[in-house]
Amino acid sequence: VFALNANKEVFVTEDFSRGTIKINKTAEDGIVADREFKVTGSDGSSYTKKTNAAGVAEFSGLKVYDVDAKTAITYTISEINVETRYETPKAQNVTLTSGTVDLTVTANFVNELKTGSIRINKQSEDNQNGDRTFTITGNGETYTITTGADGIAILSDIPVYNSENEKIEYTISEKDVPIRYVVPANQTATLTADATVD
């Protein structure tokens, strides 16, 4: 309670609301530390931060309102310097007024691995191409597929890159080859994201 005297000047300082953006990072290969994010505000502000070992990055003390524009600030959250093996996640736009009571907004980002496919087209002189077994090995993984009656087998959604962002070389081998055939030599292949290699 203030007791005011006539012609007394009173100064009032407003403390503008501040909030927090919390980023939760997950990845298909489980590597979530040191992922870099940029938060850009519609008021021209810009901040960058990296995730901790748990895949969390927090931007605190962010202004909620643009006083000049008389509106809530829209923040754009982007993952930057995304490593080659991942698809780049879409940026997200948030306002802190849409967050919790304490003006905290949580944004979830997932690193999906770039993947491709291998298509096997089995051919033989007697056209007996169905039910042939192949193994495909690479990056410490082994996959087994079997051809259909048309001699076709497709292995889909396998990683293009390893954790060092190097292209994985896959080795393709035919197994259980009937004795009447000469065993074909192994073949190798590298993949392109979202494409099929024959």
Q: What is the role of each PLM region?
A:
Residues 1-198:
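Solvent-exposed loop/turn and edge beta-strand elements of beta-rich ligand-binding domains
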